[in-house]
Amino acid sequence: MSLDFLPFSRPSIGEDEIAAVEQVLRSGWITTGPKNQELEQRFAERLGCRHAVALSSATGALHVTLLALGIGPGDEVITPSLTWVSTANVITLLGATPVFVDVDRDTLMCSAQAVEAAIGPRTRAIVPVHYAGSTLDLEGLRTVAGRHGIALVEDAAHAVGSEYRGRPVGSRGTAIFSFHAIKNLTCAEGAMFVSDDSALAERVRRLKFHGLGVDAYDRLSHGRKPQAEVIEPGFKYNLADLNAALALVQLKRLDALNARRQALAERYLERLAGLPLAPLGLPAHKQRHAWHLFILRIDAEVCGLGRDAFMEALKARGIGSGIHFIASHLHHYYRQRQPRLSLPNSEWNSARLCSIPLFPDMRDDDIERVARAIEEILEKRR
């Protein structure tokens, strides 16, 4: 009898989420409205930040954030190559140039030293990435950004619920969180921009909704004139209340969801100890890991098979997996433009990274199933 397929990730959706979405559907107001405003307020309260702006995706949030910072043609933005390629795409579409830096071989995050070495006369912003639920050396990066007068925008897509030195990621400075379907807090598609910069937050809020000073619900609830004026050209990146209602329930559950992720990750670490799988290293600073991903590095020289063959072997046993990520500079478009760029740690990891199943609704038996499958795969190659 075959086992059900175990995906690499699956959202944890319960009756409370379903009821919250149903309530919005029955309310008569399903687009951006009161649930959106409540989500922004609750998120800001949780982090202790000054401003929170909900958007339809982290990609859209980064787009309007960099635009609000004045990033454009001739500018350079420093970012690690080992991240989802949307970061490089947004920078490029603004007419700027992504300056890719390498990451630490084991934490897969960029250092303040690597970033500072890449700063040039055209550098306007730094977009470092909190990776897999672990956290960046923020103090070092803030020092570098401050010394050079360069904007720092944290990519916190993996870090909702993470803490850096006792404070939530996003509680200080500017950061962008993702609420995509596989994230620790999901609303299917969505994001949150947070900042203590009032002028930047105001412009992001304006740019995410056509460049208007108000949204549709403001005009309805506050009796403003039906056609607001465009202050500057903007985009359509607002989050609907259907999504916001789902996110609100998930926000209430976040601590419990992340605690379950941690318990599962600890079980993996215990169960897979001693196997030649090279799990990620942790930074030296104090942190709370959100365990967005559980990542192995599959090196053919020590495992007896490469990453792609390993993933196929898992699939044959009914187990899903993922790759996070193929380094951005290795994608065809960017390789054509920077053919000589060499980032050894990013490239080594790109060829070996494998994310194995990790999501709150997994059972302890699922961890055992994955561990036994991995042991079997490796044993056959010895």
From Swiss-Prot:
Annotated EC: 2.6.1.87
GO cellular component, one term: membrane
Enzyme class per UniProt: transferase
Modification N6-(pyridoxal phosphate)lysine occurs at: 183
Record-linked Pfam families: DegT_DnrJ_EryC1
Pathway terms, separated by semicolons: Nucleotide-sugar biosynthesis; UDP-4-deoxy-4-formamido-beta-L-arabinose biosynthesis; UDP-4-deoxy-4-formamido-beta-L-arabinose from UDP-alpha-D-glucuronate: step 2/3; Bacterial outer membrane biogenesis; lipopolysaccharide biosynthesis
Reported cofactor(s): pyridoxal 5'-phosphate
InterPro entries per record: ArnB_NH2Trfase, DegT/StrS_aminotransferase, PyrdxlP-dep_Trfase, PyrdxlP-dep_Trfase_major, PyrdxlP-dep_Trfase_small
GO annotation terms (biological process): lipid A biosynthetic process; lipopolysaccharide biosynthetic process; polysaccharide biosynthetic process; response to antibiotic
Keyword entries, A-Z: Aminotransferase, Antibiotic resistance, Lipid A biosynthesis, Lipid biosynthesis, Lipid metabolism, Lipopolysaccharide biosynthesis, Pyridoxal phosphate, Transferase
GO molecular function: pyridoxal phosphate binding; transaminase activity; UDP-4-amino-4-deoxy-L-arabinose aminotransferase
Gene3D superfamilies attached to this UniProt entry: Aspartate Aminotransferase, domain 1, Type I PLP-dependent aspartate aminotransferase-like (Major domain)
PANTHER family: DTDP-4-AMINO-4,6-DIDEOXYGALACTOSE TRANSAMINASE (PTHR30244:SF34), TRANSAMINASE (PTHR30244)
NCBIfam families listed in its UniProt record: PRK11658.1
Similarity-based family: Belongs to the DegT/DnrJ/EryC1 family. ArnB subfamily.
Subunit structure: Homodimer.
Protein name per UniProt: UDP-4-amino-4-deoxy-L-arabinose--oxoglutarate aminotransferase
Organism: Pseudomonas aeruginosa (strain ATCC 15692 / DSM 22644 / CIP 104116 / JCM 14847 / LMG 12228 / 1C / PRS 101 / PAO1)
